[in-house]
Amino acid sequence: HIQFIYEDDGTETISLDEAYAIIGNSEKTPTYLQAGKWAVPFGGFDTAMSTDPLTKTLGETAEAALLVGYSKNGFTLEGYGYNGDTQKSGDDDEIDQFGLHGSFETEVSGNSFSIGAGYLSNISDSGTITDNVTGGTALADYVPAWEAHGSLTTGPFVFYGGYMTAKDSFASGELAFNSQGAQPAAWNLEAAYVTEIKNKETTLAVTMQASEEALALSMPETRY
């Protein structure tokens, strides 16, 4: 899988967005291996809105990574490691960041739902935080994070929800909130209704989202 992205920001650049390979045969074994560059499975960002949820803004982490996964009967477990853009001050530039992801999805009486959770050893490697952390990419310490998300589809209605937070605070000199180290978090709730208007599928959706201690990341405190 290879995907390029075109950005018309005045420079009209084309850059590599994703490039990875998956090794496995789901018909014979539930285990698989994925290697390359992509957004690691930290967070559930499905949405019917035209803008990304704040959880994605906070935590989407695209890295060159190696992932080992297991998927069977609706259960998925994944673990991955990567060498992030940020490093502990004084440490060697090596593969020492990692993440875990687990999810379950099923269908009951025509209704489908999914739940998932994840852990990331260093949320500083998310695109938003890396671009805004003060003092470059050398950190006093890694800042782990966790998240939970879910969805429910029943008839024409679809519901999404997610929560993500740093487990610890950043050093105040790296990412601050009210003159102290920030511990950014975000959540989103969304409801969508799928129908037809003039024989065309149409989705009507509403959302409520919020962030905490994310002023330094230029994230809105609330979004509707």
List the predicted regions and their residue ranges.
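Outer membrane beta-barrel
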Residues: 1-86, 94-99, 103-110, 114, ...
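Outer-membrane beta-barrel pore domains
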Residues: 23-26, 107-224
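Interfacial loop-to-helix transition and helix-capping segments at the boundaries
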Residues: 91-92, 184
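Short, flexible coil/linker segments at or flanking structured domains
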Residues: 9, 54-56, 63, 90, ...
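A short, polar/proline- and glycine-enriched secondary-structure boundary/capping micro-motif
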Residues: 45-46, 89-90, 171-173
